[in-house]
From Swiss-Prot:
Distribution of this protein across tissues and organs: Expressed in skin. Expression levels do not differ between dark and light skin areas.
Glycosylation sites: N133, N262, N289, N347, N361, N489, N584, N602, N609, N655, N811, N850, N889
Gene Ontology terms, MF aspect: metalloaminopeptidase activity; peptide binding; zinc ion binding
Membrane-topology descriptor: Single-pass type II membrane protein
Keyword Cell membrane: no
Note accompanying the cofactor annotation: Binds 1 zinc ion per subunit.
Protein name: Aminopeptidase Q
Residues that hold substrate according to the record: E241, S380, A381, M382, E383, N384
Residues exposed to the Extracellular side: 35-992
Ranges facing Cytoplasmic side: 2-13
Length: 992
């Protein structure tokens, strides 16, 4: 050590000794305090004592011969023994997202006792207790155990073993548990043992615990309040996927760690209990207060992951049927069952099971299937093995649902969840990074199931409408994510929840469809049969799937691929975005490039240099051609050249089965435009749809001129397919255009141009609405597209549309039992209010107050914002913040009002005078959302500054930079739209 510095603080030796003594005393005091406070982080062996926990659940079957050591639970949501981020601990496996591979769970004996009682559900929470015995196999010597636990108070913990291979006897030893603590960041419970577990031996972890059930949280265990037969009632249900099982019971909460489960539920006698398996038996017990509770036990499950564990406690009725010996029951509110609302779902569920059993040649392994309809369920539906959980709006038919897409929606979702019984339940992805293996294939087979039962079902067009259109609009290079991710990319549990998105479901389904298209359906299904059979009751990775496809491809000679299946498909699943395929029809030259939002001229600024191995199915002059492959960045295909003949044209991507967009040179687009104008029916509907959607998307992102897309619309007077019109209108009549008050130059031109072409399709569907609206019942594409057609016709001022709206609205207000046809109800309500007075507005308010279905209330909320009277809108906002009728999020009302032509100015003024009331209830984030809506039309930096100054006193400091950046993005978008609109206006002048 070098000499001391000339500056500093010096003390004598005596003073130094005194300071050292004081420091030691301080450290000792801190150590004592840490030990006392450490009960929140660790439980020492001296703290363990024997004895039962008052009012706690009895031991699971087979463990009642002795009590586990216990310690008092904490009565808070934060678990007893939680090591919070502020507590220091050495680095270790508890800092990793994945469990260490020391233990493999084999079997769970799980008992849960939620304290749900009739007429006692005023509190937002209720308590539950439970016990779980987990039989595990040790794979590596360890004196430390990790398993998942979140928001649970661990009341006792014991490790028994090693277990003998024969029947259980009393000679099983115990492994001392020296310490129990929680690593909150990664949601682990850690057991420090006094001895080492031996590889190859089996042990039993015995844990008792308690926690809280939250009302409407819909994670783990939750309870809901609803109305049935005129009475308020409560039910309890579960949602374990993806990582919420750990908040219900300590477990090894990873999908690969499958085990069998014996589940016991203790519940009030006035309720029934459901779980994955059939009921095995019932008995009774009394709690410390003498109250009687029912103990319901269930049969042993197959091997399954923790995320499929399910239970429900409710006072429901059911309807049932048997399909191939399997009992199928649908449970719902007693009113709903009595009214026959579950009949449609019940009638199609069995046949869907049978179809998939036959398709995969694998029987459904459970003896029963229960499907329960919850009054509200944010996850829409969940495929739990043996107990599927649905939001009732997606399972039950109402009497007024006849002219809606409800039957199709129920069919889609039931097919999806039943498909999971094979993809996900029988064969589970090894980890969440490959979640598309279950969600993508379940989404894909929705369409095969429905097409089987309804051969007239227009599978390609509906797939585009439901799946492809949405994901192609969101997926692009650099920003979006890949379908399959590397496990090491995940660092937090919250990232798993983010995987349930368009890329998992829609892109996953689209890639499965593309794979099927270039292999053919027989090869595709044969490979899936092999995959499902091999990995039944086990787990698989993406490479396992590719291996089975390769095996089937290698066993035949008809399908020849340019590369192994893995090499082809990994490009699509591991890379983000998708390619744009551009064909020069004069030379046959084809190239691929990544699709970007707002392509820039200097492509070197972008770093996405990936290519794909692209299957090109194509047609020439209406005739299907042989499959070719674009397996590098560019390639020449002489067979794709076209002559000067007006009858010579080429379309790539047959039936839109490839996951890419298609561009052509100017000659190629011109040929297609000419064919549309000469004989549009020569081009299949799916390709008229494709050309419109591709051309507008490519024009908005600088791949082609906007005039190229607009040229394709000239033929529309001859277009009688409403789904093609839908593609035109969603691309041409956008929300930005409708709400832009500066579009006065374009509007009259667009009105004249579109009405001239739209009148034919309008007359067709307006006649159906007036004379035989029931005819729409089985036309799914019309039910999907009609609202946009109706909305646009009225926005363009078509008098017949406005008159029909007035007729339907007046008929409904005079006789509310005469329902407005569902597909156009929102539009009719809006125009009824817009052209009405406060009398019509008050009528809707009264209807809102008497509606219980959230979907209907949302429609009415939107319609009431359509008023053009400032005083009515101001009163609406007052009601939203201060009056009783609006029990949902009042900021939604302000947002829908702000989006209206008159309302944006009313909301701005209202916020000046009422921000305190709004901010206290909803915080500044609601203000930020409103700011973006109000700022939708900004186009200068001065407008940004003015808007920020207006809101400056209401924003928190950390939000100001974010908001300015967002407003700058809006400004740039608006400037781009302004330039685009100017070019569209010029084109309309020439062609109107």
């Amino acid at each position: 050590m070098g000499p001391p510095s000339s500056s500093g603080f010096y003390v004598s030796r005596a003073v130094a000794l005194l300071l050292a003594a004081l420091a030691a005393a301080l450290l000792l005091a801190l150590a004592v305090l840490a030990a006392l406070y450490g009960r929140c982080a660790r439980v020492q062996p001296s703290d363990l004592h024997h004895g039962g926990v008052p009012d706690a659940a009895s031991s699971p079957r087979g463990t009642q011969e002795e009590q586990l050591p216990t310690w008092p639970p904490r009565p808070t949501r934060e678990p007893a023994g939680t090591a919070t981020p502020g507590h220091w601990r050495p680095p270790g496996p508890w800092d990793q997202l994945r469990l260490p591979p020391w233990l493999v769970p084999l079997h769970y004996e799980l008992e849960l006792w939620p304290r749900l009682r009739p007429n006692e559900f005023q509190s937002p929470t209720l308590s539950f207790t439970g016990r779980v015995n987990i039989t595990v196999r040790c794979t590596a010597a360890t004196a430390r155990l990790l398993l998942h636990s979140l928001f649970l108070d661990c009341e006792s913990a014991e490790v028994r073993g090693p277990l003998s291979s024969g029947p259980r006897d009393g000679a099983v030893g115990r492994v001392p548990v020296d310490d129990v603590w929680f690593a909150f960041d990664m949601q682990y419970m850690v057991l420090e043992l006094g001895a080492t577990l031996q590889p190859g031996s089996r042990y039993e972890l015995q844990l008792s615990f308690s926690g809280l059930v939250y009302r409407d949280l819909r994670e783990g265990l939750f309870f809901s309040i609803y109305t049935d037969q005129g009475e308020r009632r409560a039910l309890l249900a579960s949602q374990m996927e993806p990582t919420f099982a750990r908040s219900v019971f300590p477990c090894f909460d990873e999908p690969a760690l499958k085990a069998t489960f014996n589940i016991t539920i203790i519940h009030h006698p006035s309720y029934g209990a459901l779980s994955n398996m059939p009921k095995l038996g019932q008995s009774e017990k009394r709690d410390v207060n003498g109250s009687v509770w029912t103990i319901t036990t269930f049969s042993t499950t197959p091997h399954m992951p923790t995320y499929l564990v399910a239970l429900a406690i409710c006072d429901y009725d059911h309807v049932s049927r048997t399909e191939r010996g399997q009992e199928i029951r649908i449970w719902a509110r007693k009113d709903a069952i009595a009214n026959g609302n579950a009949a449609f779902a019940l009638n199609i569920t069995g046949p869907i099971f049978s179809f998939l059993e036959d398709l995969f040649n694998i029987s459904y392994p459970l003896p029963k299937t229960d499907i329960i309809a919850l009054p509200t369920f944010d996850n829409s539906a969940m495929e739990n093995w043996g107990l599927l959980i649905f939001d009732e709006s997606l399972l039950l038919m109402q009497p007024n649902d006849q002219v809606t897409d409800k039957k199709a929606v129920i069919s889609f979702i039931l097919s999806h969840e039943i498909g999971h019984q094979w993809f996900g339940n029988l064969v589970t992805m090894n980890w969440w990074n490959d979640i598309w293996l279950k969600e993508g294939f379940a989404s894909y087979f929705e369409f095969g199931v429905i097409n089987y039962f309804n051969p007239k079902f227009r599978r390609n067009e509906v797939f585009f409408s439901n799946i492809l259109h949405h994901v192609l609009s969101e997926d692009h290079a650099l920003v979006s994510r890949a379908v399959s991710l590397k496990v090491e990319n995940f660092t937090e549990t919250s990232e798993i929840n983010e995987l349930f998105d368009l890329f998992t479901y829609n892109k996953g389904a689209s890639l499965a469809r593309m794979l099927s298209s270039f292999l053919n359906e027989n090869v595709f299904i044969s490979a899936l049969k092999s995959y499902l059979k091999t990995f039944s009751y086990s787990t698989a990775e993406q490479d396992d799937l590719w291996r089975h496809f390769q095996m089937v491809v290698d066993d035949q000679s008809k399908i020849l691929l340019p590369a192994p299946v893995k090499s082809i498909m990994d490009r699509w699943t591991h890379q983000s975005g998708f390619p744009v395929i551009t064909l020069n029809v004069s030379t046959g030259a084809m190239k691929q490039e990544p699709f970007y939002l707002g392509k820039v001229k200097n492509q070197t600024l972008l770093t996405h240099n990936d290519t794909w191995i692209v299957p090109i199915l194509w047609i020439k002059n209406g005739i299907t051609q042989s499959l070719v492959w674009l397996d590098k960045s560019s390639k020449i295909f002489p067979e794709m050249q076209v002559s000067d003949s007006d009858h010579d044209w080429v379309i790539l991507n047959l039936n839109m089965t490839g996951y890419y967009r298609v561009n052509y040179d100017k000659v190629g687009w011109k040929k297609l435009k000419q064919q549309l104008e000469k004989d549009p029916k020569a081009i299949p509907v799916i390709h008229r749809l494709q050309m419109i959607d591709d051309a507008f998307s490519l024009s908005k992102n600088n791949y082609v001129e906007i005039e190229t897309a607009l040229d394709l619309t000239k033929y529309l007077a001859e277009e009688d397919e409403i789904i093609v019109w839908y593609a035109v209108l969603v691309n041409l009549v956008t929300k930005d255009l409708v709400f832009d008050v500066n579009n006065y130059d374009m509007y009259p031109l667009l009105k004249k141009y579109l009405l001239k072409r739209l009148i034919s399709i309008w007359n067709m569907y307006s006649t159906v609405i007036r004379e035989n609206v029931a005819a729409l019942q089985d036309d799914y594409l019309a039910l999907v597209a009609l609202e946009k057609l109706f909305e646009t016709a009225c926005w363009l001022g078509l008098e017949d549309c406005l008159q029909l709206s007035r007729e339907l609205f007046k008929n409904w207000t005079n006789h509310p039992e005469n329902e407005i046809p569902y597909p156009i109800k929102s539009v009719v309500l809006c125009y009824g209010v817009a052209f009405g007075s406060d009398e019509e507005w008050d009528f809707l308010l009264n209807m809102y107050s008497n509606k219980t279905k959230e979907e209907e209330r949302i429609q009415l909320t939107y319609a009431m914002s359509c008023s053009k009277d400032p005083w009515i809108l101001h009163r609406y906002l007052e009601y939203a913040v201060t009056a009783a009728p609006f029990t949902f999020n009042e900021t939604n009302i302000m947002e829908v009002v702000a989006e209206s032509e008159v309302g944006r100015y009313i909301v701005k003024d209202f916020l000046i005078n009422n921000w305190q009331a709004v901010s206290e209830r909803y915080g500044t984030q609601s203000l930020v959302n409103l700011m973006y809506i109000i700022g939708r039309t900004i186009s200068t930096d001065l407008q940004i500054t003015e808007l920020q100054q207006f809101f400056s006193n209401m924003l928190e400091e950390h939000q100001k930079l974010t908001v300015r950046a967002k407003l700058q993005t809006i400004k740039n978008k608006n400037l781009g739209n302004k330039k685009l609109n100017a070019r569209m206006t010029a084109w309309l002048r020439k062609n109107t």
